[in-house]
Amino acid sequence: DLSARSAIYTKADIVILCLPDQAAAEAAEVIGDKCRVIDASTAHRTHKDWTYGLPELTSTQRQRIAGADKVSNPGCYPQGYLLLVRPLIEEGILSAETLLRCNALSGYSGGGKAMISKLEKTPCNDEGMISRIYGLNLDHKHVSEMQIHSGSQVRPIFIPTVCSFYRGMTIQISLFSSELNGHQAKDVYDCLHKRYENESFIKVIPFGSSKPLTDDFLNPLGCNETNEMELMVFGNREQIHLIARYDNLVKGAAGSAIQNLNIMLGCDENIGLI
């Protein structure tokens, strides 16, 4: 009932929309200027009238979120990509014209109710369900968000994989040193470390550290049930590999919404988050 919803919106300070894209767009239309809103759907993430809700994106993003009436919560996949790529473009380590390639792993909870229902009916020992690559038309719905908010002039190639575990995520970007305008892997680390050294939820792992690895393997579940994102730089003189690891349900979704809610209300950003 739209009239009932409208009455509820009028009484609220902030509404968080957790709806499919079309329903979120319709709800936002009903809300109008009745209250402030955070939209967790894809509907408004590249809309010019909405503020993008990734506080760590730039030095001024928090201030923009704090004063915004309409905030679009970022997508799970784009967050890691953006926090790895944007500083490198801003600092001139990467050109905005660089052709970027990104692979990602996610727990199946990222696919929503339909995927969760489908995959939980399939035994995890089914070899065909261990991992599933998708987005092979190279037009995943997050690609525009990844390009626009990174400052890139070109759409990245983005290939995600849904895995048999419920939650957890890694974003991976491979680069050649020849693409870095004379810079090396350590320069990439230094750039990311400088950008995020004072952030509560972004942790840049020391360059060359094996601490995140277990028997030389990286577990994509390593940040689960926290709002923390770990950024890692691996490489040699010729090649660099960037990784972001986080929980797709927390930092990748609900945790970011709580972060934005805290900022918009003028509260301590860390309240309700670990």
Question: Model segments located where?
Answer:
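C-terminal substrate-binding/catalytic lobe of Rossmann-fold NAD(P)-dependent oxidoreductases
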Residues: 1-6, 98-99, 103, 108-242
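Active-site catalytic microenvironments for nucleophilic, acid-base chemistry
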Residues: 87-91, 176-179, 260-267
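NAD(P)-dependent Rossmann-like dehydrogenase/reductase catalytic/cofactor-binding core
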Residues: 228-274
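Loop/helix-junction capping segments adjacent to catalytic residues or to phosphate/diphosphate-binding pockets
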Residues: 78-82, 182, 251-252
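Predominant activation on well-ordered alpha-helical scaffold segments within soluble catalytic domains
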Residues: 82-89, 143-147, 189, 193, ...
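Residue-level signal for short, function-critical loop segments
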Residues: 76, 179, 248
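N-terminal Rossmann-like NAD(P) cofactor-binding subdomain of oxidoreductases
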Residues: 1-129, 134, 234-236, 271-273
